Amino acid sequence: MKPTLLALALLLPLSVQAATDIQRWRNRDGTQILLVERHENPIIDLEVSFKGAGSVANPDGKSQVAEFTAALLTDGTQELDEEAFNAEADNIGAHISSDSNAESASASFRSLSKADIRDKAANLLNHSLTRPRFDEAVFRRRQIQSITGLQQQETTPDYTATRELTKLIYPNHPYGS
């Protein structure tokens, strides 16, 4: 009896994933759009992903360019400095962020799905992508944080081991740089 319950408990997440209805289409420009609807909570999560904008696109000898640029995207817009941008997001209870990985960069928001709140959050995200601020003071602060973070990582054996293993696995490839 217990092994059967354990097997069912382990398989349950797989059956839930398999039951997820993913709607797919492309807009006029060819952008692929995926939509998963769940109406249990009045929340919307939206993510815009840019394939090829990750760390594999970093210029030679300039690691962290993609990561740094992605982090700066949601630090304000041409109209709103970082503080005002964050205040606008906080006022509507939205979480707006950007990130990158090896293959892509992304920007996203989470907010209530109520139309006026959703539209304000989408507008903030849109402006951060189409009219980013790239404020000099924020850039310098992020630069110091990034350098400090990299220096701290260099002191951990697991980071050093992973970096060296990646170089061995992916010689002459951006993954290994």
Language model region names:
Residues 82, 86-87, 133-151:
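Acidic/histidine-enriched alpha-helical segments
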Residues 36, 41-68, 82-128, 147, ...:
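M16 family metallopeptidases and their MPP-like homologs
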Residues 8-18:
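Hydrophobic h-region of N-terminal signal peptides that target proteins for export
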Residues 18-43:
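N- or domain-start disorder-to-order transition segments that initiate the globular core
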